[in-house]
């Protein structure tokens, strides 16, 4: 259940709400509203601070009850950490900490006043839209496949978060991005027996059909065969769940050239003949998170009605294994006409993407971005904090990096030097689909670059940033924030 958001300018000590959220720094300095409530309550917050109950350390919080002079029955005091280090990341964490602290409290409506805090190089509108994104992310609960009683328990709690401020533009953008992120997370978290290629196609088609200005075209196997998508169809051969190519369009920019996003949509990746093993295969439902992210970005763009043209392409495929599955040493012909020698069937993402990228050329993109959980090598290099970015275009790299920094959905650029290209040489085809042990994220990007010649193109490898690790890990919805901000910056 998504949070509901509103702006509120009522005096915090008299506002009607279940809880007012304030902050305290590690040096015991109170946020402006905390100072106001402290004065109204006769110094109660200061007294608790002096007693050591409120430390101000990041990650800590305390729920205070029935302060004298304060109408709200509860005040949540959130630790902000060191004041001189309080930046975008610390602000986002504090908002998330506040929402998580209220998870089990009998609070359905709260007023967040952390939006009043000064954040370096940010303004009031940013504070509000980032608070919306962070709060919605923290409040997210997966319930799609839970039983009735557990689903009811998970859906209880905070319903409405009022944010202190008046920047309506920040609220509108924040809600759009939050909805796009949540849409992507919901798709990514579904089990693969539900989120099949057909389900992904049906879900996105329904969204487009219910939002004026958006359209959706679904290409089936026969359409792809007619187009010569031999690489994509080779990956799909081993699965009973047939492939679909999803093409979403938002026409908000008249006759202008469109921005095109392509997202890897492997709804489950067994590895194929090069079968994955336990310790990795159980998380392969997340291999469609690139597709989910570009769909989520489309949702955000439609919700905020961006004045540009946007096309989203998702090759939705399951990489499974049967007697008809493609094999190592097969040579397949891509839509571009280039032949590809298969060195490993678990390097399937680049095969479905190369045909989707070739298909994208027909739209004459202003810029072409692909998003994929493409390589474990990228996760080894960058961990889960940063998305890997590769492009030959410095201006495009700077645009994407700047957008990511602005919304704290950050990326890090990796090289696409010519010296890596010869690692993809093949004796039997135009290109080999793997590049050896070293620089795997880069050679995967180099492979895709061979199918984007002449395009203003960038590749985002989200293998690390798309999901959290472990039994309780979930899809993150990244990089919906980065991509949406990048599109907003183009308007």
UniProtKB/Swiss-Prot annotation:
Q: Which organism is it from?
A: Xylella fastidiosa (strain M12)
Task: Provide the catalytic activity annotation.
Answer: Release of an N-terminal amino acid, Xaa-|-Yaa-, in which Xaa is preferably Leu, but may be other amino acids including Pro although not Arg or Lys, and Yaa may be Pro. Amino acid amides and methyl esters are also readily hydrolyzed, but rates on arylamides are exceedingly low; Release of an N-terminal amino acid, preferentially leucine, but not glutamic or aspartic acids
Which Gene3D superfamilies does its entry note? Leucine Aminopeptidase, subunit E, domain 1, Zn peptidases
Superkingdom of origin = Bacteria
Function, in words = Presumably involved in the processing and regular turnover of intracellular proteins. Catalyzes the removal of unsubstituted N-terminal amino acids from various peptides.
What gene, per UniProt, encodes this protein? pepA
| GO terms under biological process | proteolysis
Q: Which PROSITE patterns match?
A: CYTOSOL_AP
Question: Residues that bind Mn(2+) 1, according to the entry?
Answer: 269, 346, 348
Q: Keywords assigned by UniProt?
A: Aminopeptidase, Cytoplasm, Hydrolase, Manganese, Metal-binding, Protease
One Gene Ontology molecular-function label:
manganese ion binding
Q: Which residues form the active site?
A: 276, 350
Recorded protein name is: Probable cytosol aminopeptidase
Q: List the EC numbers from the record.
A: 3.4.11.1, 3.4.11.10
* One Pfam family named in its UniProt record: Peptidase_M17
- Binding of Mn(2+) 2 occurs at 264, 269, 287, 348
Task: Spell out the GO cellular component terms annotated for this protein, sorted alphabetically and separated by semicolons.
Answer: cytoplasm
NCBIfam families according to UniProt: PRK00913.1-4 (NF002074)
Q: Which HAMAP family match?
A: Cytosol_peptidase_M17 (MF_00181)
Which family does this protein fall into? Belongs to the peptidase M17 family.
UniProt main location, coarse = cytoplasm
Annotated cofactor note: Binds 2 manganese ions per subunit.
Q: Where in the cell is it found?
A: Cytoplasm
């Amino acid at each position: 259940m998504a949070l509901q958001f509103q702006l509120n300018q009522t005096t915090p000590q008299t506002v009607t709400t279940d809880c007012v959220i304030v902050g305290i720094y590690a040096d015991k300095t109170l946020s402006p509203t905390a100072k106001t409530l402290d004065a109204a309550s006769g110094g109660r917050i200061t007294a608790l601070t002096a007693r050591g109950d409120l430390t101000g350390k990041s990650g800590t919080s305390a729920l205070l009850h029935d302060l004298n002079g304060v109408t709200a029955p509860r005040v949540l005091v959130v630790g902000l950490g060191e004041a001189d280090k309080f930046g975008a990341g610390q602000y986002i964490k504090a908002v998330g900490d506040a929402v998580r602290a209220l998870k089990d409290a009998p609070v359905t409506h709260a007023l967040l006043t952390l939006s009043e805090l000064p954040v370096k190089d940010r303004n009031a509108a940013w504070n509000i839209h980032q608070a919306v994104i962070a709060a919605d992310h923290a409040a997210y609960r997966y319930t799609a496949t839970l039983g009735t009683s557990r689903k009811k328990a998970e859906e209880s709690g905070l319903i409405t978060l009022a944010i202190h401020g008046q920047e309506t533009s920040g609220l509108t953008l924040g809600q759009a991005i939050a909805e796009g992120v949540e849409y992507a997370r919901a798709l990514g978290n579904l089990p693969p027996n539900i989120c099949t290629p057909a389900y992904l196609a049906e879900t996105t088609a329904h969204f487009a059909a219910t939002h004026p200005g958006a359209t959706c075209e679904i290409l089936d196997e026969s359409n792809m065969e007619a187009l010569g998508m031999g690489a994509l169809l080779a990956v799909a051969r081993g699965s009973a769940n047939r492939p679909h190519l999803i093409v979403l369009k938002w026409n908000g920019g008249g006759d202008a050239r469109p921005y095109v996003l392509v997202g890897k949509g492997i709804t489950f990746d067994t590895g194929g003949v090069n079968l994955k093993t336990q310790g990795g295969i159980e998380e392969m439902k997340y291999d469609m998170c690139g597709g989910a992210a570009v769909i989520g970005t489309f949702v955000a763009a439609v919700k905020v009605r961006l004045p540009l043209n946007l096309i989203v392409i998702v090759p939705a495929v399951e990489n499974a294994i049967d007697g008809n599955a493609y094999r190592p040493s097969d040579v397949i012909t891509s839509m571009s006409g280039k032949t590809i020698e298969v060195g490993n069937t678990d390097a399937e993402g680049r095969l479905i993407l190369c045909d989707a990228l070739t298909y994208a050329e027909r739209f004459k993109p202003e810029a072409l971005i692909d998003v994929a959980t493409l390589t474990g090598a990228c996760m080894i290099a960058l961990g889960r904090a940063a998305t890997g970015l590769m492009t030959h275009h410095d201006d495009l790299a700077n645009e994407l990096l700047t957008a990511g920094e602005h919304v704290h959905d950050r990326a890090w650029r990796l090289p696409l030097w010519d010296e890596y290209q010869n690692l993809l040489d093949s004796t039997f085809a135009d290109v080999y689909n793997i590049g050896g042990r070293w620089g795997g994220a880069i050679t995967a990007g180099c492979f895709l670059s061979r199918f984007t010649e002449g395009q203003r193109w960038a590749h985002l490898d989200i293998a690390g940033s798309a999901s959290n690790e472990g039994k309780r890990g979930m899809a993150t919805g990244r990089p919906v924030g980065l991509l949406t901000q990048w599109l907003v910056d183009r308007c």
